Amino acid sequence: DLGMEGEPESVKAYYEGAATMGEIAKKAAAMEGADFVALILEGGDPNGVNKSVDELIAVVKEVADAIDAPLVVEGCKNVEKDAELLPKVAEALQGRNVLILSEKEENYKAIGAAAGLAYDQIVGAESAVDINLAKQLNVVTTQLGVNAQKIVMNIGSAAAGYGYEYVVSTMDRIKGAALSQNDNMLQMPIITPVSSETWGVKEATASEADMPEWGPEEERGIDMEVMTAAADLAAGSDAVILRHPEAVAAISRMIKALA
């Protein structure tokens, strides 16, 4: 919801001419290889821009009205604000069948009940790279009355090389339990936010002046995004959230080649 502020230059170039959030969303939906659009309501963070819920809902409606593609709406990552915001998002988009990211242990009653029950959206259940926490959140969400088929897991993420082995091992255990043990509380699809992790690490942010041997800064960011997304998909993730058009196209080509 913050537009192109702070984005890499080639990302800005792709969205050139898009002056509103609706226009940006249309360009995102038209990106080569894109299967869905993710709207991140970062501006709602009370420790950041701190947009009001009403302001954010207006953005959500504008984006939803602009595209026909499947829509993921992610909160601001502040537990209290998301507990207020995401139920309103679910209400505003009733009938659209959007994925609401994410409920957590601290706010699952507010978000899960609104998104999964009152407004029949898809509930994103976010845990912190732990199979037991992931399963427990799925269990308590279904105990609210949410259909298990309306739950998608976000089991946590990391950039490749940054404790990433914990993500892989957790996905491996989840998929193993879901398949070999027929654990129906771990059989939900997994979505992994990749770009929020990869574009913040030093390999993507260090300038060419500081690290000339690493090559062009933006290419490194794309490489980190592609490598991490490919590893997530190989480990068991069913969908990944990406930022750079080249990364989206590369991962789409990889999926098609392996299909």
Name every feature range the model reports, one short phrase each.
Residues 1-27, 48-51, 75-79, 101-103, ...:
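Active-site mouth loops of central-metabolism enzymes
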Residues 1-2, 37-44, 155-156, 193-196:
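Short loop/turn segments at strand-loop or loop-helix junctions that form parts
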Residues 5-9, 33-62, 67, 73-80, ...:
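Glycine-rich, proline-tolerant flexible connector loops at the mouths of alpha/beta enzymes
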Residues 21, 56, 60, 82, ...:
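Aromatic/hydrophobic pocket-lining residues that form the small-molecule binding cavity
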Residues 28-32, 58-66, 87-94, 111-119, ...:
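Acidic (Asp/Glu)-rich catalytic clusters
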Residues 38-40, 49, 70-81, 95-108, ...:
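Catalytic beta/alpha-barrel core
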Residues 66-72, 96-104, 180-192:
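Short, acidic/small-residue loops that bind anionic groups at enzyme active sites
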Residues 106-247, 251-254:
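Catalytic alpha/beta core domains of metabolic enzymes, predominantly
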